[in-house]
Design a protein with these regions (language model features):
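Conserved coupling/switch loops of ABC nucleotide-binding domains, chiefly the family-specific signature
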Residues: 76-79, 129, 229, 376
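ABC ATPase nucleotide-binding domains
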Residues: 92-249, 253
Length: 389
């Protein structure tokens, strides 16, 4: 790591350096036919040097939004700034951005060295500066030994490093990465996630990263922008997004296995609230009620969200929370090493619990489980907006 930091310092101290830049969206919209919008009223401030991840299902508008930053897609309405500069009508080559694509976009007939140098040659950068930039970037990315090879002679991970290196030598103020790990196998994806995160740490420039993989989003971003149908659903730090999803969609999209959702009727007796889930009546803690709008949902059906890890099989937890304990007939077990996923029916709903594999459980067993209601999420059934966490 010290070697990497030293090389980056040398990289910055040479000809040129990364200009820092924020990115600001003001009411940005995108339509291809002038009628139907694929990105709606997009408002977002990305801070200088921040690593922001756009995540969402296919077709949610995340790549289109990234391409608008790059200038590869026109903006139909609204304003886009890089730093203090309005860039709506600025050509891609003049936006001071570098982009890394899913398919690497390397020239197959050129060596790694020539691929990395190509953009600089077009800009008529002197050869001695090009050579220095390539040498320094290759050291940082550990691809020095591949500089004279063709892309076909490299592995997927090596080709991805070359694509990153080609972006690095541009000295761009913004890095845009469009699903760069999608073509890699699982082991290599895990490795490259840490490589890209480390690269951001040492370069200290603005990164915008697009993915459909919530694991990538949660492990890489300073903040995550969750998108659906062209709309921003929530913008938050990874842990806040996980702990306090503002909608049913975000709650279900972030987390694996995904959150369990149960229909329940909210009841109140005196000052005490409870949830009727099937034939079970489970009290709600006072702390969850305070500051919420639960009062207006009394005698109405709501949706209760329970993360798999908040369903426990430990005797000590069951004794502490007997009111939320129940018997479950396990019909499927996924063993994941140190933990396992238990699948079962609960009050007419399919439910998954994530528990320690140290407790011996087999398919067909009846086990005692208990829900940690302090961690429960309650959503409006009609609007799917969070009521309380």
């Amino acid at each position: 790591m010290y070697f990497i930091y030293f090389e980056v310092w040398r990289f910055f101290s040479g000809e040129g350096y990364f200009n820092m830049a924020s990115i600001t969206f003001e009411g940005v919209k995108k339509s291809y036919d002038g009628k139907n919008f694929v990105v709606h009223d997009f408002n977002l401030q990305i801070q200088d040097r921040e690593f922001v991840v756009f995540v969402g299902p296919s077709g949610c508008g995340k790549s289109t939004t990234l391409r608008m930053i790059a200038g590869l897609e026109d903006i139909s309405e609204g304003k886009l700034y890089i730093g203090d500069r309005l860039v709506n009508n600025v050509l891609p080559k003049d936006r001071d951005i570098a982009m890394v694509f899913q398919n690497y976009a390397l020239y197959p007939h050129m060596s790694v060295r020539k691929n990395m140098a190509f953009g600089l040659k077009l800009r008529k950068v002197p050869k001695n500066i090009i050579d220095k930039k390539i040498s320094e970037a290759a050291k940082i990315l550990d691809i020095e030994q591949y500089l004279d090879r063709k892309p076909k002679d490299l592995s997927g991970g090596q080709r991805q490093r070359v694509a990153l290196g080609r972006a690095m030598v541009r000295d761009a103020s913004v890095f845009l990465l469009d699903e760069p790990l999608s073509n890699l196998d699982a082991k290599l994806r895990n490795h490259m996630r840490s490589e890209i995160t480390r690269l951001h740490d040492v370069l200290g420039t603005t990164f915008v990263y697009v993915t459909h993989d919530q694991t990538e989003a949660m492990t890489m971003g300073d903040r995550i922008v969750v998108m659906k149908d062209g709309y921003i659903q929530q913008v938050d730090a990874p842990q806040d997004l996980y702990d306090k999803p503002n909608s049913l969609f975000v709650a279900g999209f972030i987390g694996s296995p995904q959150m369990n959702f149960l229909d329940a009727i909210l009841l109140k007796e005196g000052e005490c609230f409870s949830l009727k889930i099937g034939d079970m009546l489970i009290p709600i803690s006072r702390g969850k009620v305070d500051g919420s709008d639960l009062e207006s949902y009394v005698n109405k059906t709501v949706i209760v969200g329970i993360r798999p890890e908040d369903i426990h099989n430990e005797d000590v937890f069951i004794k502490v929370s007997p009111e939320s304990a129940f018997d479950a007939d396990i019909d499927l077990i996924e063993l994941m090493g140190s933990e396992m996923y238990l699948h079962f029916e609960f009050q007419g709903h399919r439910v998954v619990a994530r528990v320690s594999s140290r407790v011996t459980t087999r398919k067909g067993d009846r086990v005692k489980l208990s829900i940690d209601m302090h961690k429960a999420h309650i959503f409006d059934k009609e609007t799917e907006i969070a009521i309380c966490h």
